Each structure stands twice: as C-alpha cells, then as structure tokens.
C-alpha cells in the first residue's frame, strides 16, 4: 500500500515537473502572450490536474495523444507560437519526454535485467524511475534549450530562471 502511494506521489511530482518544463520551454522559445501571472498559474494547475487524470487511465496512446494536443493548444493560446514553427518545437519537446522515459527504463533494464512491463509492475522501481526521469528530462530540456537559443539573446535568460 505504501509502495503504491509512493508510486502515485512520484508520478504526480513527475507530472508537475513536466508541466513546469513545458511552460518554461514555451516561454523561452515562444514568449508569453499575456502578462497575467494568475492566468498562467490557473492554466498550470488545470494542465497538471488534467494530465494526472489522463495518466490514471494508463493507456499509452491516450497519454501521448493528450500530450500532443495539450502542448499544441497551450503554445497557441498562451504563448506567441508561430504556426509554421510550433509543430517543430513541440515535437522537439515531445522527443525530450519520450527519450527521458526510454533512457530511464533502459537504465533499469540494464542494471536489473527486467523488461519494461516488469519494471512498471514494481511500485518502488516506478517511484525511483519517476525521480530519475525528472533528472533526465531536466538535462534534456537544458541541452535542447541551449542549442535552440544559442543565437537568440531573449533565450539567454534561461540560465537565471530555469524551471
């Protein structure tokens, strides 16, 4: 019971961090459309809540579809995303999420020799995997943002207020 609770809490923390990174990434790459912190705060809370609910379904294609639609809608509604470019940047961020998950589970698979399904069924490994996933996501986020913003002076601010 405690292991399941820790697994759920770590998944929720992971979801919060994913959304912090998405909002931060979009702010750096696109720029905010509005000045209201309340609007972005409410949008963040709504996004985290919705993502946690979708994650509870535990159907990978549904999670992926939700994440794609959510990122596209968010980038257009709350950020100054150029319609021609936002598909590419959103795909890049989606790849960060995908590869961080793949790297995390590959790590456990290499160390323990377990398959993805076996790792998922072990709540303590899932909890630790979620925390490791956060680290890998953050590193991927920083690397990609540094690459995308190397010639853009507005993006250089990310070093002082990263996530």
Task: Describe each PLM feature range.
Residues 158-163:
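Conserved small/polar residues in nucleotide/adenosyl-binding loops
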Residues 1-7:
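Short, strongly hydrophobic alpha-helical membrane anchors
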Residues 40-48:
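Alpha-helical transmembrane segments
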Residues 12-13, 17-38, 52-157:
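Juxtamembrane segments at transmembrane-helix boundaries
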